[in-house]
């Protein structure tokens, strides 16, 4: 049994990706986790994977975690507050202000409710995709409100810390505005770009490289879930999209008249603003430090990537990030390795000396 902070029995409502992942992580800590879901099959799967046990009518949880779709979160939280009058209830939905408003309309006892949101997930859902380490090192927002005391809410922070996540305190409105910017609008932009590929020629799609893969990576997300999320956070998302639209309109105007005075500067300014924005995204350990990249060509045969990573370690270089790319039909792959700038030149020299081919290196 692992050391843990949380000293309460936990009830998880919703045996999907997040609920099952929470159950897996808490069960590994020795917490008694009971699982409930409208789908008996989902509960059985989650139990089989080790996320807890089926809930019973005799359970007296101290903490209830609601992990259901956003459009039924408030009603489910209200039901759990009524059914377990001694329990603290939280949810992990990706929007917060609307849920709190609905709970107040329903007359729920929000003195025992505190909404949270783990900034973690996967493109695929369901209990079979769950992982006990899903939350490690990830921000987990605690969306506070005036109706609950911090002493009562302490168990929420214990839960987050036990799951290896990093607690971040925000108001419900701050949370919704923040996730509109860093999650909801990027999802829409990725989806809109990917939709253009449906009408692209086979020849164009065959040229797909890492750029289009990066932009469209999250476009395979569940449409039904995202309709709920976007509808629940519509105003902040629409406000940001209007500013994106203004930028796109400026780019269109400049490209339609590329020789007009100021057109090239408009494009350059947009690109520069993008550089400034991406530089603000925290990297490893929350640092905004920029890294150097070198692209290593790897034969598409078993064991080559493992050999490269082993040799980088033997050279005493700490790899900050890694991205892989394959070209259709090619028998070679490309590993883009990120390192601190001062390590770039020595690493290129050392890998070249060991027979590795570095793209762009002479």
Q: For each predicted feature, which ranges?
A:
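NAD(P)+-binding Rossmann beta1-loop-alpha1 motif at the extreme N-terminus of oxidoreductases
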Residues: 1-55, 63
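Phosphate-coordination loops involved in phosphoryl transfer and adenosine-cofactor binding
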Residues: 6-9, 61, 86, 137
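Short beta->alpha hinge that forms the Motif I/post-I loop of the SAM-binding pocket
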Residues: 38, 68, 92-94
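N-terminal Rossmann-like NAD(P) cofactor-binding module of classical short-chain dehydrogenase/reductase
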Residues: 64-65, 90
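Rossmann-like NAD(P)(H) cofactor-binding subdomain of soluble oxidoreductases
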Residues: 76-127
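Internal alpha-helical scaffold of NAD(P)-dependent oxidoreductase catalytic cores
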Residues: 134-220
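Interdomain hinge/lid region at the active-site interface
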Residues: 203-274
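A conserved regulatory-domain signal marking ACT and ACT-like small-molecule sensing domains
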Residues: 277-362
